[in-house]
Each structure stands twice: as C-alpha cells, then as structure tokens.
Amino acid sequence: MTRMAHDLIRPPKARRGERVAVLSPSFAAAGAFPAVHEQAMRRLTEVTGLIPVEYPTTRQVGAAPQARAADINAAFADPAIRGILAVVGGEDQITVIPHLDAGLARRDPKPFLGTSDNTNIHHWLWANGIASFYGGSSQVHLGPGPGVDDVHARSLRAALVTGETIEVTDPGESEDVGVDWGDPRALDCFGDREPTGSWSWHGPARLVSGRSWGGCLEVIEQVLTAGRFPFGPDVLDGGILLIETSEELLPARNVGWIVRALGERGILKAAGAVLVARPPVSDFERRPPAEERARLRAEQRDVVAGMIGQYNPEAVVCVGIPFGHTRPQWILPHGGAITVDGTARRVVADYS
C-alpha cells in the first residue's frame, strides 16, 4: 500500500450496548418525518446492537449552523458516545464546518458515517487526521421499506462494530428514490427497483491498494472552492478516489466539468484507482423510461471514465458500485484502505 505523508487515525470500534450519536448536521429529516426516523432508530439497534442518542438539533428543522455544530462538538466531547451517524444530507453543511472544534475530535476520535452533504464533515475529519466512513444515512437506508438491505447492514456493522474486511459486491437491484417519507407506505415499501448491470472497468488490468478520499462530487467542488482541502494533490498519491453524484441529477456534461477541474487540480493524476458510484437518474418528478435511464447512466459513465483517462491513463477505474445516492448502498471507508483489482475485477474494503 502506498504511504502518504498525511497520517490518519482509524477510530476504535464501538461494542454492543454502547451509545452512538444520531445527528442532523444538514437537513433535520428526523423532525420533518419522525415515523421513518423512529423506525430507523429501532433498526439501528437491531442491526448493530448499539444504542442511538439524539441531540437538540437532531429533530430541529431549520436549526442554525452554530447549533448543529454544537451537537457535533458535544458528541465528540462525550466519552460515552462511541460513534456518530448522520440522519441524512442537505445543502448547507458547508456553513457548519467553521464552528467545529477539531481538538475535540482529535482527543477522542470516533467513527463518523454520512453521505452527500456530509462530504463536508468527512473532509474536515480527513484534514484533521481522522478516517471515517462514507455512507449510512439512517433516514434513507435504515428507516424506509420492509427492512435494511443486506449489503448496507453488513457494511454498517463493519464500520461501527466489527472492523472486518469485506469484498464489495453488486446487490443485483437498485432504486433511485424510495417512497415519499410523508406517505405511510414508506415504512413498509421499497421504491421502484430495477435489475443492475455489470460494473464497468477501465484503465490497466492491475491491482491498486490505497486509502480512500472523495465523496459527493458537487460537495467536493464546494470543499475545494472554500479552500478546505489544505494539501497538495501529492497527499493523495496512489490512493483510491471516490466519486458519486447527488439527487440533483446533474447532466453528464456538468459532471464532466467538475471531474475535469479535479484533473486540473492534479487529483486525478494522483489517484491509483477511481471508484465511481452508480448515479441516480430519476426522482419523484422525473422518471424517464428504462431505456432513457440506462442511456443517462451510460452517458455519465463515458464522460467520467473518459475524463479520468485523459488525465491519468494508468488509473484503474470501476464505475457502478452502489455507494452513493442509490439504494441498496454500500458504506465505504473514507481514509481507510480499499483494494481495487483491475485484473480479477474485484473491490475489497478494510473497515478497521
């Protein structure tokens, strides 16, 4: 594994019966849709054996950034809290970051799980020397539907409790959106699922093992624009770049623009491998026919893989892994080790 200059701590795991904070660093979906949230909390304990603890802004819709940051700081400061989970993403977490206390996180690092807008916190932790886990929105992946998807439950337990190494495999089905959380059917029904195809591999047939960095592409752009990645691209040398896109459904052309900017920043050249998540291509208002959905996914795949190839033809690229805004979702290490085998076409994640 390539060693990078910026060392990262991997927080210790929780033990069954211990407490984990459930926070709303962005949108407080727990307050807007409490029935789904409460089912998520029950399932969290069933799947992990851990006890969820809510904070003042967990259910407070519209809480100020300072108040949300105070809850994050309090969770890191409490020695009884052994992990932190975000309820969901949002769109203004960038305003929370200036109010966080890095000293508290460094004194008692603990696993943090979240996706989408929580890319802000992942990068704040990474910059302060703490690894985390990308994925795990309780409002999306624990509360809705008849149960928790197997791949999500396995990676959730690994991230919080067991720390095992797992091969990341395709679940065989996917949904872009579930049932509206305000609809009682959300507690019992999945969204419209469709079969998935094979992942798409690009670049040389070689094995790359390194630590991961990345997240939601639209938020990575914000992080870099705000100057909150205070390193040169060499700190990512040989690592695994994670890229996924949000429910905003950016056209492939716009996605390509952001990826090209990462290339100009030197980030694509530094990566040993790139994992690109299966993108959502529909929402509640826009549900194209199956052929159009397949075309939209292929268009993004071709643009992203082509752009990476221009800047780094030696990178191993795998497109289609469900670690982003679709469900079922794998939680992946952020700052931890991932092995991408372009020869055997396998991906293995170390959750220690």
Stretch-by-stretch model annotation:
Residues 2-80:
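ATP/NTP phosphate-donor binding region
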Residues 22, 84, 117, 220, ...:
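Buried hydrophobic positions in well-ordered alpha/beta secondary-structure cores of metabolic enzymes
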Residues 80, 105-111, 128-130, 271-272, ...:
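A short helix->loop->beta-strand "cap" motif at the edges of active sites that frequently abuts
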Residues 85-94, 99, 115:
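N-terminal glycine-rich "phosphate-gripper" loop used for MgATP/nucleotide binding
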Residues 100-125, 131-140:
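Short, acidic/small-residue loops that bind anionic groups at enzyme active sites
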Residues 134-217:
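Conserved anion/nucleotide-ligand pocket segment
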Residues 212-254:
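Oxyanion-binding "anion nests"
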Residues 252-352:
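C-terminal active-site/capping subdomain that shapes the small-molecule cofactor and substrate pocket
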